[in-house]
């Protein structure tokens, strides 16, 4: 007899209802809960999945390279990046009538194609690729890499090649390896690629597999390196008149500190980027020798943590400090994952900011739709990672936390004064919410009643002061870098001449610090409200995961439970999973405000109409009317009774996204009993219908659990939200700028 799914849980496999399928899917990746799981097997399984993950990433990159080479227009785009639209891939669709075929035959193609808004063309071009053949080579290389990663994943599951538990628990060696080899060497290797391939290509000198061993990246060779005369590598940089990809205006420097942007490409100088990666690489290689392993030199993390205690007799008595944290972290995968997700979440949000404020890829600053798409993409990923960090933090408290081992240390004391933390977050959220909404609503009322001069408009003077300190001249603050005769400004001019031009937007629209006013002040505080409320829900979920006054034994019920009946006066909605679920709604709300703000402010700048944002962003109707409604007008005319244009696919997705989003509420508002009754009625009808009753169920159909219905509702809400805004963003930007 065939074994029923799921094979990893005999208890579930024997469940006679459809619960078996849904619980099986829900716990497929919860390796800890699987039958016969040991700690060593758990680590080994997770280790192998990392190779599978790398293989998927490699295949994805390979697919992008392949489709651009096969169906794109990379070589034409390279010849004129500012005017040729990059093609992502061809579209073949049997539903296309002649109108759609004509509309999507664009960017010089002879058949329907999609325009690329990924920035991949700019990336490939910047790192030295100029021909389709090079893209194909890259694609094949990535496929080989993926095959190797898959093999490595398989190999490390074989008995002879499974690492031991002790190997996984060796934190010092792992940190040294990650710091020195993964971060350090890869950064230096990337410097090597930039210096040997990308920089010569940017100066019109081809470097490929045929000549890379014979072309010297710098005329002085390695002499200055070995003699310590490193300054030679910074001499003779590219001039401000350099034409990217040609010898015109090119220098010979490979490692510089110019600051600012290349005037033509409006991207960071490649020689600055190479210098940055070399410095980062060297620092990480040094850092990778920090922890004590084989040779008895360096730091022991355990000793560092044990030593970090407040002196005895400290006023306020700060407890046991960091004692016990080494084992707590080292023995909890959820704690480690929480730390990793939190770090990666912050970095991803910073990437969103820096990719547009300081673009590193040639000409990407002028591709406005790509800029908008990449900013939004990275901010959405950031909120997902951050919510995941707190989810695994909560699971740590439920499954891995040992109160005795953490008695009176910083972690134990966090739990002991959780009420103070949660109530402060609550107070901040309430303060921000009432004051920000109060200002917006006041402004709406006075504008509605015809007296816009009565708006409460607050200038963000502190933020303007910070901008001025970094060199922003527009506000007239005579401070630090904005003080033309001051020591700071003189030093800056000597060491990083391009910075002031970049800060003040001297060249083009690529202005590092945008001027800010009352509209920015208000939306900044709206975003602060969203961030603090999301944090409140997530932090409360984690700190209350083990128990609360209402439910002291909560940890015994696990991470996700619907409630413990009516006996305690209402225990629904208080599991750690419910906190995660509620927080995702607030996170989506917040990222919506962040991306609305970014997009509208930039649309106004790109269209040369900054007054629209400045005047309309101070009251809510301005946002609804002049951002959302006005910018969806082109989009919703993508198709109409008279035909369709190349926005049609986005307008259809806009509609479809709304549908998916609205479907979520069907699951979020109705609970399990309704569906169970409905299912039983449908089963009754099925069993009494001729022909239909010839087929039965192997599993008795039952409704989803309360928690599952919530996750289905949340999934629809999230996917619909993303599809709707993604379609709006791309169509409203590309409809104006291509």
Curated annotation (Swiss-Prot):
Chlorophyll a B1 binds at residue 658. The PsaA/B heterodimer binds the P700 chlorophyll special pair and subsequent electron acceptors. PSI consists of a core antenna complex that captures photons, and an electron transfer chain that converts photonic excitation into a charge separation. The cyanobacterial PSI reaction center is composed of one copy each of PsaA,B,C,D,E,F,I,J,K,L,M and X, and forms trimeric complexes. The gene is psaB. Belongs to the PsaA/PsaB family. It catalyses: reduced [plastocyanin] + hnu + oxidized [2Fe-2S]-[ferredoxin] = oxidized [plastocyanin] + reduced [2Fe-2S]-[ferredoxin]. The chain crosses the membrane at residues 46-69, 135-158, 175-199, 273-291, 333-356, 372-398, 420-442, 521-539, 579-600, 647-669, 711-731. Pfam families: PsaA_PsaB (PF00223). SUPFAM superfamilies: Photosystem I subunits PsaA/PsaB. It is a multi-pass membrane protein. Keywords: 4Fe-4S, Chlorophyll, Chromophore, Electron transport, Iron, Iron-sulfur, Magnesium, Membrane, Metal-binding, Oxidoreductase, Photosynthesis, Photosystem I, Thylakoid, Transmembrane, Transmembrane helix, Transport. This is Photosystem I P700 chlorophyll a apoprotein A2. One of its GO terms (biological process) is photosynthesis. It comes from Synechococcus sp. (strain CC9311). PSI electron transfer chain: 5 chlorophyll a, 1 chlorophyll a', 2 phylloquinones and 3 4Fe-4S clusters. PSI core antenna: 90 chlorophyll a, 22 carotenoids, 3 phospholipids and 1 galactolipid. P700 is a chlorophyll a/chlorophyll a' dimer, A0 is one or more chlorophyll a, A1 is one or both phylloquinones and FX is a shared 4Fe-4S iron-sulfur center. Its main location: membrane. One of its GO terms (cellular component) is photosystem I. Its EC number is 1.97.1.12. Phylloquinone binds at residue 675. PsaA and PsaB bind P700, the primary electron donor of photosystem I (PSI), as well as the electron acceptors A0, A1 and FX. PSI is a plastocyanin/cytochrome c6-ferredoxin oxidoreductase, converting photonic excitation into a charge separation, which transfers an electron from the donor P700 chlorophyll pair to the spectroscopically characterized acceptors A0, A1, FX, FA and FB in turn. Oxidized P700 is reduced on the lumenal side of the thylakoid membrane by plastocyanin or cytochrome c6. It comes from the Bacteria.
